Amino acid sequence: MPAIQSPSGKILQLEMENFKSYKGHQLVGPFKDFTAIIGPNGSGKSNLMDAISFVLGVRTGQLRGSQLKDLIYAFDDRDKEQRGRKAFVRLVYQMDDGVELRFTRSITSAGGSEYRIDNRVVNLDEYNGKLRSLGILVKARNFLVFQGDVESIASKNPKELTGLLEEISGSEELKKEYEGLEEKKASAEEKAALIYQKKKTIGNEKKLKKAQKEEAEKHLRLQEELKALKRERFLWQLYNIENDIEKANEDVDSEKSNRKDVMRELEKFEREAGKRKVEQAKYLKEIAQREKKIAEKSSKLGKIQPELLRFKEEIARIKAKIETNRKDVDKRKKEKGKHSKEIEQMQKSIKELNKKMELFNKKRQDSSGKLPMLDSQLQDYFRLKEEAGMKTIKLRDEHEVLERQRRTDLEALRNLEENYQQLINRKNDLDEQIKRFKDRQGEIETSSSKYKNETTSLKTELRALQEKHVNAREASAKLKTRIAELEDQLSDLTAERYENERDSRLTQAVESLKRLFQGVHGRMTDLCRPNRKKYNLAVTVAMGRFMDAVVVEDENTGKDCIKYLKEQRLPPMTFIPLQSVRVKQVFERLRNLGGTAKLVFDVIQFDPELEKAVLYAVGNTLVCDELEEAKVLSWSGERFKVVTVDGILLTKAGTMTGGTSGGMEAKSNKWDDKKIEGLKKNKEDFEQQLENIGSIREMQMKESEISGKISGLEKKIQYAEIEKKSIKDKLPQLEQEERNIIEEIDRIKPELSKARTEVDKRKTEMNKLEKRMNEIVDRIYKDFSQSVGVPNIRVYEETQLKTAEKEAEERLELSNQLAKLKYQLEYEQNRDVGSRIRKIESSISSLETDLEGIQKTMSERKETAVKITNEINNWKKEMEECKQKSEEYEKEILDWKKQASQATTSITKLNRQIHSKETQIEQLISQKQEITEKCELEHITLPVLSDAMEEDDSDGPQFDFSELGRAYLQERRPSAREKVEAEFRQKIESKTSEIERTAPNLRALDQYEAIQEKEKQVSQEFEAARKEEKQVADAFNTVKQKRYELFMEAFNHIASNIDKIYKQLTKSNTHPLGGTAYLNLENEDDPFLHGIKYTTMPPTKRFRDMEQLSGGEKTVAALALLFSIHSYRPSPFFILDEVDAALDNLNVAKVAKFIRSKSCQAARDNQDAEDGNGFQSIVISLKDSFYDKAEALVGVYRDTERSCSSTMSFDLRNYQES
């Protein structure tokens, strides 16, 4: 196949203004033969590709935007809302001869597109035409591969590949025409076949009509004879019916006169009863008013009772609280008295110690403690003492130091012992408080738990009672509503309805028949009913004597029933056998007459198996709402038998029977008998359910009582929780204080022990120094001691020293006792025992104030309750008096009603007699109507004495019976009439049987001539259809061949190139031959209607489906197909968006090498199909192993200062490897 030459030229540069993420005017380029667009994600690379696609005419929907305004740069939503925003993209295209073309597409302020070529405004068709002349096919997108297109092509099924190839080849443009002609061809073929079949059918029909023509004449002759026989029979029947109607009317007039007298008496009785009812109503009204007031006050009393219970609980709780507080005050007062006594005792002890201290000081001052001594001896003593002092000065200094240290240690020891004792006392107090709080906490827990259990139990009981109350109230309301509804329905249904003895006997008789004979269905009144109550009277009149007819399965069952009635001497009944009864078909046109007219048959509800019986009873009788409409239907144009909803009957013969009698109304009320019994039973059931529900008032009282108890318990729990929380808050503080004191005691104990050790140590050291000092002094005072007669000088001084030491110890003891008592007195005085007593007494005062308020409110509520109770009792008393008066009037009303009932019974009896006669008359009239209807239906004209449209007092026109023979005009018994009827029936059946045996087509003559003409027309139609079929088939084959050629041209080109391209993409040093790829058609006759199988085999791998290839292998296969398709419809440039995304580095290098080989100037100059066509490549890529093969780079980056995308270009040709 000759190579398809690629158009020359390339994209030189791109200008943009406010397009997508590119703000203001920006210039991109120049673009080289192989240009790579790079940049980080989100920088705007794809927007640059969208700009090239936009200027080349690609639709907005493919550019990630729903409308053109979405493509205009906008920093935020405020920018988007600004009016007058514009944008444009201009592409500078350079031809091989250096001529530049400028394609510009702008977005106007109105949101539309404007196209320019070299700054000249053109329309879209001219714009696309110019692009097409350069090899740029916008619709086929042969110059563009969007991001994701490679994956999309790799995942296409065979049918989708066919669609892609159709789009590329252009055969898709013929698809609509192809399918339209294909449909026309099938339609033309079907039409020709139908006309041929029609022609064949008409030929067969022509033979049949010829035979039917001869049979028709004989049949018409027999029909005329049958019509004359029926006319004579109908005249004889009408003659007998009119005589019977005249006798029955005389009897009815007599009975009606008697009924009128009795009705006057009934009116009198009812009038008297009405007067008594008016008087009784006054008392009943008074009773209702009293009941309403009692209910209102009872409701108010019901609200007060729970309040009284709640007040009672509150009073008990407050009293208990006051009692507890008083006991606590008494206890604390005792403690206060004890505390005061302790303070007095301490103050007394302090005074005594102070006195002892004063006496001790005075005694010490008075006592000198010295022994008598001579003056010379005294001088020697002082001299020696001075000498001893000089020799022991150093030791005395050390002794004084130790003495001072010992006094300091003793002072510290006394302080530690005092602190220790204070801490021990405070710890004991805290232990006592903590124990008291914990005991109280236990008591509160026990009582609170008890109250909670009682509350839970009462709440459970209350919920159950409330649920029962709500359910009872809802059930009571529903039952009362249902009972009221049933009473209304019963009132409507039973108004003016009285039991009929004859109907009762008939009902019992029918029940017996149903029990004895299997084929008895029941009476018409039991088996069907009007679908709406307003049609009751109309259906009753339309059915006439058949309303009480009994429906049986067959004639034998009917005969057995008649025999049983005769044996039991029961009233006669009419029977309708379903199997043998003959009915007229419903005329469908009568259902579409308009207005309120309907078929009586359509307003009756019945079981489908009883359809024949109902149709036999009512026929094609119509029902409508108004008399005027009935007259129009019955007497204008085609005549119909019509009955109004008021019971007025209009016949085809022109007669009109109107007015309603008691008998007719009672008869129409039979439709409601079953419903009334059901309603009565339902009412009794509902009343029993209402009685079983119980008293709602008692439930309310009990509910209020339990609510009051719960409220009291919840208050107790609330107060317990408050006290519990107070203890819970204080207890940790006391325990923490105790822990702190214990820690302090533990800290002081070692210090106390250490202090005592230090004191003892100082004492030992001092004793050692004193011993050394004594030895020195003894040597010095040796001679002096002998002279004064003492072993040593200390004997002289000991008396004074011991006395001093003893005095010092006594003084220390007194000081310690005094300090201890002062500290204890200060501690006890700081304990404010009275504040707690004052606080509790204040609480008691507040509680007593609350108690007085609640007791006062409770007293007011009690007074209100007593007042309401007295009012209720007074009203009950008045209500009882009204009830007595009402009962007296009720007795009088019952007496008058009893007399009215007797009159009503008489009227009912007379009504039954009148009804019996009227029923007889109605049956006779119905029979007469049926006869006239049969005559009209069978087109039999009866002789009349006057015009058929004239009316008189009789039931229909006056027939002329003069044509009857004298034998037929004689009065006969029923048995004789039956015999004559049997003779007529035998003659008619014989004639009918003869007619039925012929069964000709009476329209055969006319049909025979018509079918001859029809045969001629069909032959002409068949020839025209064949001609049309040939024309459509020729047009279809032409389009099919053109579509086939376009498709196969593209397929053959792509199939022949794909293997070469795939080998170039997959070959390597290891596998120099590369892989294998080929395309196969699933159907070679109609390839565009079926799929294309694309198969690839990568190097070293066996054949496998495309779905089983790896992601990279699929991408390489898809690229091979894309490049093959491009070679068929080559564009001067090829723009690819991240086609290397799924490729590994090795495949990236291969694809880059391939694109470079096709993009270099040499490849573009050498347009050879063997190696594929050269083209300019613009590729978006994120992989450096790909874009480092390009001749130029266009870098896209995000300009953060301007909040837009910007570009920069870099020429790589100077850095390419040779």
Curated annotation (Swiss-Prot):
Motif (Nuclear localization signal 1): 183-190
Summary of the tissues where the protein is detected: Mostly expressed in flower buds and stems, and, to a lower extent, in leaves and roots.
Binding site for ATP: G39, P40, N41, G42, S43, G44, K45, S46
GO MF annotation, one: ATP hydrolysis activity
Major location (coarse): nucleus
Signal peptide stretch: none
Keywords noted in UniProt: ATP-binding, Cell cycle, Cell division, Chromosome, Coiled coil, DNA damage, DNA repair, Meiosis, Mitosis, Nucleotide-binding, Nucleus, Repeat
Intracellular or extracellular location(s): Nucleus; Chromosome
Chain ranges of the Zinc-hook domain: 11-1200
Domain topic, free-text comment: The flexible SMC hinge domain, which separates the large intramolecular coiled coil regions, allows the heterotypic interaction with the corresponding domain of SMC1A or SMC1B, forming a V-shaped heterodimer. The two heads of the heterodimer are then connected by different ends of the cleavable RAD21 protein, forming a ring structure.
Primary role: Central component of cohesin, a complex required for chromosome cohesion during the cell cycle. The cohesin complex may form a large proteinaceous ring within which sister chromatids can be trapped. At anaphase, the complex is cleaved and dissociates from chromatin, allowing sister chromatids to segregate. Cohesion is coupled to DNA replication and is involved in DNA repair. The cohesin complex also plays an important role in spindle pole assembly during mitosis and in chromosomes movement. Essential protein plant viability. Required for chromosome segregation (e.g.
Name of this chain's protein: Structural maintenance of chromosomes protein 1
